[in-house]
Amino acid sequence: MDHIRNFSIIAHIDHGKSTLADRIIQVCGGLADREMEAQVLDSMDIERERGITIKAQTAALSYRARDGKVYNLNLIDTPGHVDFSYEVSRSLSACEGALLVVDASQGVEAQTVANCYTAIELGVEVVPVLNKIDLPAANPENAIEEIEDVIGIDATDATRCSAKTGLGVEDVLESLIAKVPPPKGDPAAPLQALIIDSWFDNYVGVVMLVRIVNGTLRPKDKIKMMATGAQYPVEHVGVFTPKSRNLDSLSAGQVGFIIAGIKELTAAKVGDTVTHAAKAAAEPLPGFKEVKPQVFAGLYPVEANQYDALRESLEKLKLNDASLQYEPEVSQALGFGFRCGFLGLLHMEIVQERLEREFDMDLITTAPTVVYEVVQSDGSTIMVENPAKMPEPGRIAEVREPIVTVNLYMPQDYVGSVITLCEQKRGSQINMQYHGRQVQLTYEIPMAEIVLDFFDRLKSVSRGYASMDYEFKEYRSSDVVKVDMLINGDKVDALSIIVHRSQSQYRGREVAAKMREIIPRQMYDVAIQAAIGAHIVARENIKALRKNVLAKCYGGDITRKKKLLEKQKEGKKRMKQVGSVEIPQEAFLAILRVEDK
């Protein structure tokens, strides 16, 4: 066991995490040269394109060190984005060490810091590495200073490397072996294995990626999940050297996979503990929690007959993404669809993109909303994740909205504009620190404000230099109201929005004005109204198109013309009673694009 090292790599998007992983795999001979491709561990196309890692992957590598011994290195690749922070904490708790990769030309960024703190809290040894030192813009001294300043770990002897050219990668491995402690654990104790990740394979069912903490696991053993109590017979165990390789047993300290013929991904929850059914461990490993969705949106097929196809696609996606939740929903305006829950905005975008890409779906997405806690006047509390389910204003005692703590990092030139943005978003400043040229701002902002367009606006006010991460803090009482949109007196449920009272009139007016531009003119007048309860706050009219019925009258008597105009008026009136207004897809997106003033 002294020759095992379990480690993961922490880095901000585009600081070269996946490239470094590729180089390490190459140096250790995990894949033949012809199988080497860029970003080996990012298996989804969308992961490669966006340059992000979504699912955790592992590689068990053997490396002959300079002291002549052969070490088994288990690389656990972690997602770097804040939406997947729970997956990150599970991957990190399976390691004893983490390589902190910092781009020598850019310095420390927000998500690196968030994940690095997670690592330090879990007691993981952090080994700093400066990447991209082959760039002319690289400034290693500055980067070292930032690491010590912002994260507070000693980085004077940080290893320097360039993952692109392969320079210094062996030094990284050497310092890893020297600094990271070997795993502790007893192969003879009752089995405890932490599920780092799980995914669905069409041939063998669910594959669980585990770190064995104590005990030994062999095929044909009966295992039990400690969160659910379900039992399964083990079919195969083994390791990935990115390619899977079956072994006779996995014992304490190793990272590998278990295949046990599990059909449902929900049975193998990330962070759960696996133990033997017969000789069970006394207690599960700490840190398991159910992941709760933070952001909700309605997904509807553009063609009504695609509903079943959408359901199947969501079922298939759920096989590989246990944190995705969905339930059927009916909207008067959009027909049948699903209310889906996501971990955050990036997660939502990825799910939509995968549905459109891998399953060829055409989707309409409603505005994303967050979950409100509503205390009704009879004292009961309900959770509302859909504006349509918000009770009438008279039945509400108070509404609490989720507040998140946001950490922002940016160069000091942009502090002013970022603070202005946070104030607009009803944020309250908690802290502000200077680290050299970088500034760290901490704000508490309502989640609803972040969901809308906070990230995009943050990037635009800071010219792309600011980075952020957020975590849920608490529910707090707030004066929020539901704004309904009425078209010719009929409520359109999919256009309802929940906003703070201070912005409700403004948002109502804006949405009404947007709708007026988007809805095509009809044969009769269309009234668009925004209402809070029974109180109308805004109205826009779309004038009717009319045919010139007098074109055929030359001269003649006025009564003749009057008769024709009256007849036209009657017709329009009748039309208005039976007609329904088609609402184009853009109208639903219009809500998203309303800027806060």
UniProtKB/Swiss-Prot annotation:
Cystine connections: none
Domain of life, per lineage: Bacteria
EC top class named in words: hydrolase
InterPro entries membership: EF-4 (IPR006297), EFG_III/V (IPR035647), EFG_V-like (IPR000640), EFTu-like_2 (IPR004161), G_TR_CS (IPR031157), LepA_C_sf (IPR038363), LepA_CTD (IPR013842), LepA_IV (IPR035654)
Classification via SUPFAM superfamilies: EF-G C-terminal domain-like (SSF54980), P-loop containing nucleoside triphosphate hydrolases (SSF52540), Translation proteins (SSF50447)
EC number: 3.6.5.n1
Gene Ontology biological process terms from the UniProt entry: positive regulation of translation
Claim: Methyltransferase is one of the keywords in the record: no
GO MF assignments: GTP binding; GTPase activity; guanosine tetraphosphate binding; ribosome binding; translation elongation factor activity
Keywords: Cell inner membrane, Cell membrane, GTP-binding, Hydrolase, Membrane, Nucleotide-binding, Protein biosynthesis
Gene3D superfamilies to which the protein is assigned, alphabetical: 3.30.70.240, Elongation factor 4, C-terminal domain (3.30.70.2570), Elongation Factor G (Translational Gtpase), domain 3 (3.30.70.870), P-loop containing nucleotide triphosphate hydrolases (3.40.50.300), Translation factors (2.40.30.10)
Cellular component, GO, one term: plasma membrane
Primary site of residence: membrane
Catalytic reactions on record: GTP + H2O = GDP + phosphate + H(+)
Family: Belongs to the TRAFAC class translation factor GTPase superfamily. Classic translation factor GTPase family. LepA subfamily.
Protein name: Elongation factor 4
